[in-house]
């Protein structure tokens, strides 16, 4: 049973890679078929080579973009350009390798398959980092509470998550009496040094907190409803080399945040009724908010993150870039496996 569970976990964990290789294989087959077809039509050899390459590239990109990494359509143009550039550089490099390391009596088709296969892993790493960097990511949320047992949590989830989401809440925003301990954030950064840390400040006066947490944060979410000048706070965050995100609740009128959203790289939608408390149910009103923001004409400029009540059933129909969960992951029998399930879940909306 352990072996079967381990296999299932690996299949979920490396889903992107497996499908990337499979799609890559079929794209090469399609490219070679097109190459021979153009040769049959007696089209110039170099032109046949180029046309076949373009067919293979677009085929691989389309399947990876929509069916493997499942990235929002607003990111299509940027991803296509990067995919094309990386693929062309890879193709040129493979041509040079095949030219200088020619083996007699090996056909063009065999040479193309061997050289491209040799670069699959490198290609995957480059495309995942650049072309398809906007795939849906899964983060686990923690309160900066003194009661947090960080080592226990690390043993449960390891490095399997995509990012860390920190909730810092004070009594100006919520009745939840959290004893915030900034030292925990420093430990979190030390425990997950390679992971992006999102810090969500639930406070009407966030400036005092920003000064304490900004060193250990990569993205800072600030609520639209604060009693300070939000644009001044935004500039303060950006001047420190960090990303600014605007956070809203389901009581926030979505149209009223459009001005500040145009200046933001991230949007956080709290999909629960009473922010500041964990373990709540997902409020389906959040779907209307997600749909509204997904249809904006500047959608490609920001990422949408949804936090609150998200489980493996909700994530299937949630068209967001990032999802945050606490109870559904940490409360499961196998949190690391649950993260892998979240990451492998396809959008079926």
Predicted features, each with a name:
Residues 136-155:
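N-terminal pre-domain/capping segments
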Residues 2-134:
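Interaction-mediating elements
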Residues 139-145, 163-177, 192-212, 217-230, ...:
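Catalytic beta/alpha-barrel core
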Residues 224-226, 271-278, 320-339:
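Glycine-rich phosphate-binding active-site loops on the catalytic face of alpha/beta enzymes
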Residues 177-186, 281-290:
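Charged helix-capping and loop-helix junction motifs
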Residues 186-192, 233-241, 245, 287-298, ...:
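Surface-exposed amphipathic alpha-helices with a cationic face
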Residues 152-157, 205-215, 252-262, 309-323:
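Catalytic cores of alpha/beta
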Residues 157, 166-167, 213, 267-268, ...:
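Conserved, mostly hydrophobic/aromatic
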């Amino acid at each position: 049973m352990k072996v079967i569970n381990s296999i299932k976990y690996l299949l979920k964990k490396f889903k992107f890679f497996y499908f990337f290789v499979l799609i890559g294989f079929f794209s090469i087959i399609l490219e070679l078929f097109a190459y021979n077809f153009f040769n049959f039509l007696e089209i110039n050899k170099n032109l046949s080579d180029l046309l076949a390459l373009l067919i293979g590239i677009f085929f691989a990109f389309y399947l990876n973009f929509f069916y493997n990494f499942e990235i929002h359509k607003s990111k299509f143009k940027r991803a296509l350009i990067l995919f094309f550039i990386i693929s062309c550089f890879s193709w040129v490099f493979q041509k040079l390798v095949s030219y200088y390391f020619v083996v007699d009596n090996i056909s063009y088709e065999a040479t193309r398959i061997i050289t491209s296969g040799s670069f699959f892993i490198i290609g995957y790493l480059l495309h995942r980092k650049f072309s398809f960097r906007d795939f849906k990511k899964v983060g686990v949320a923690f309160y900066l509470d003194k009661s947090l047992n960080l080592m226990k949590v690390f043993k449960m989830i390891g490095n399997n998550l995509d990012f860390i989401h920190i909730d810092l809440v004070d009594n100006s925003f919520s009745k939840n009496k959290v004893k915030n301990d900034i030292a925990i954030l420093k430990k979190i950064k030390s425990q997950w040094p390679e992971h992006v840390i999102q810090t969500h400040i639930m406070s009407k006066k966030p400036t005092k907190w920003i000064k304490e947490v900004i060193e250990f944060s990569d993205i800072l979410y600030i609520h639209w409803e604060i009693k300070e000048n939000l644009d001044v706070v935004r500039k303060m965050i950006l001047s420190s080399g960090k990303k600014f995100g605007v956070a809203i609740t389901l009581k926030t009128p979505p149209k009223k945040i459009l001005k500040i959203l145009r200046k933001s790289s991230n949007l956080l939608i709290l999909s629960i009724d009473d922010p500041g408390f964990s373990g709540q149910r997902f409020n389906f009103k959040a779907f209307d908010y997600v749909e509204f923001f997904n249809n904006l004409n500047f959608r490609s400029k920001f990422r949408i993150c949804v936090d609150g009540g998200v489980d493996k059933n909700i994530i299937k129909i949630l068209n967001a870039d990032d999802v945050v969960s606490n109870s559904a992951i940490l409360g499961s029998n196998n949190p690391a496996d649950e993260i892998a399930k979240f990451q492998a879940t396809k959008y079926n909306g």
